[in-house]
UniProtKB/Swiss-Prot annotation:
Residues making up the signal peptide according to the UniProt record: 1-39
Temperature behavior of the protein's activity: Optimum temperature is 37 degrees Celsius.
Chief location bin: secreted
Keywords: Cell wall, Hydrolase, Secreted, Signal, Virulence
Molecular functions per Gene Ontology: phosphatidylcholine phospholipase C activity; phospholipase C activity; sphingomyelin phosphodiesterase activity
PTM statement from Swiss-Prot or TrEMBL: Predicted to be exported by the Tat system. The position of the signal peptide cleavage has not been experimentally proven.
Reaction(s) the record says it catalyses: a 1,2-diacyl-sn-glycero-3-phosphocholine + H2O = phosphocholine + a 1,2-diacyl-sn-glycerol + H(+); a sphingomyelin + H2O = phosphocholine + an N-acylsphing-4-enine + H(+); 1,2-dihexadecanoyl-sn-glycero-3-phosphocholine + H2O = 1,2-dihexadecanoyl-sn-glycerol + phosphocholine + H(+)
Stated name of the protein: Phospholipase C B
UniProt source species: Mycobacterium tuberculosis (strain ATCC 25618 / H37Rv)
Induction notes from the record: Expression is induced in vitro in the presence of phosphatidylcholine. Also induced upon infection of THP-1 macrophages.
Miscellaneous remark of the record: Polymorphism was discovered in the phospholipase plcA/B/C region.
Family: Belongs to the bacterial phospholipase C family.
GO CC, one annotated term: extracellular region
Region (Disordered): 501-521
Amino acid sequence: MGSEHPVDGMTRRQFFAKAAAATTAGAFMSLAGPIIEKAYGAGPCPGHLTDIEHIVLLMQENRSFDHYFGTLSDTRGFDDTTPPVVFAQSGWNPMTQAVDPAGVTLPYRFDTTRGPLVAGECVNDPDHSWIGMHNSWNGGANDNWLPAQVPFSPLQGNVPVTMGFYTRRDLPIHYLLADTFTVCDGYFCSLLGGTTPNRLYWMSAWIDPDGTDGGPVLIEPNIQPLQHYSWRIMPENLEDAGVSWKVYQNKLLGALNNTVVGYNGLVNDFKQAADPRSNLARFGISPTYPLDFAADVRNNRLPKVSWVLPGFLLSEHPAFPVNVGAVAIVDALRILLSNPAVWEKTALIVNYDENGGFFDHVVPPTPPPGTPGEFVTVPDIDSVPGSGGIRGPIGLGFRVPCLVISPYSRGPLMVHDTFDHTSTLKLIRARFGVPVPNLTAWRDATVGDMTSTFNFAAPPNPSKPNLDHPRLNALPKLPQCVPNAVLGTVTKTAIPYRVPFPQSMPTQETAPTRGIPSGLC
């Protein structure tokens, strides 16, 4: 029998009993729980940053922090009173269910327990463009979320979807992971806009705002521009430093991987990867997920740095099921846990590329006008696709969820520090000494390097290994999502989710209490 080391005054068994009691999705959790419990129990000795030999970066799609974790305890969520706070957004009238400049809408729950077609599991994909997100931000007032959606909503009833959120009942696995490891409530996407430019920041800390190397990149092209960009990306820095790396991509969609729904890992968008014999192509384009990733873990060949793309259908991108995305995260964790020698030296960082058009109440840090590298400087701004004449600021974008999953980040822990996608590159820099030359001075000074998310002072916490598979409980949610997944993703015409009326302001959970990790020690 595994030992019962207490965590924040609560044994592991008590923790999971409490977590299971907090959700109606007990069956779903009963299958995923053992996987997470095994991860929770892995117990390397207290140590240092150098004890982490593998950094695995897994990026999901289009969710804001408030949208997923606004009700999570001890975080900067719906109970936040730090000014300026604008939870009540003007532009939609919940009583008349219509666009109304005088109407006020509060954040409201997407209830995933409702019947087919009207459940909140699969909702319409809000606009999250460079134009739309700058309009929502509104010069820092953060008060224009609903009007910003109107021009991009073919069905008026989908305008207020920007204000929807989930709770523990709707996202049992996400909340269980947040309770078990480190959650970051100050993690922002890198750019006020969509997927491709934010993923470029994740991979390179740059979108070429001066237009010298194929940019600026402000939108998601329908067809990825293969071998078009030429600025330096982080894999090249790792290669030069002799630090092993790979990009693992799910290639289920075949040729569609090079389209707006594929997210091809971005390495093959760069001229440097044109030669299939180059290491950029061999390690940045060829590896598959999950097969090659699982094989490398099994055979002790996992590189020092990995970028993981589970695939669009599992990405949590609206209007696909949110809990199927949870399966993708747990599956990656399960692969790492399959080899304890690898898991004990690994940090898995799960983040989301951008907020997806979903409301977040925290105003992101932004630089003053003219800050080098943080505004688009090409002479003809109107010639830049998707710019709408807006030069910036580029970022930071709005908050997104981020979980740090590692034997060195056992929780429940929280970190309030400011991070963005370039923080993962700064962590690589801190651990392996590899420079991030594209990182601007302003951004380098503004965001942390994520070393504070680890609790290196914590003692080992071994437990009995126990694995199971959650997929059987996620798949039944798919049939009711088929119409919305197609309509809401492709044409943004999903069946609208009706805003409840009368409304009341949501509140946060009061438990569990979250500690602060020690960071470097």
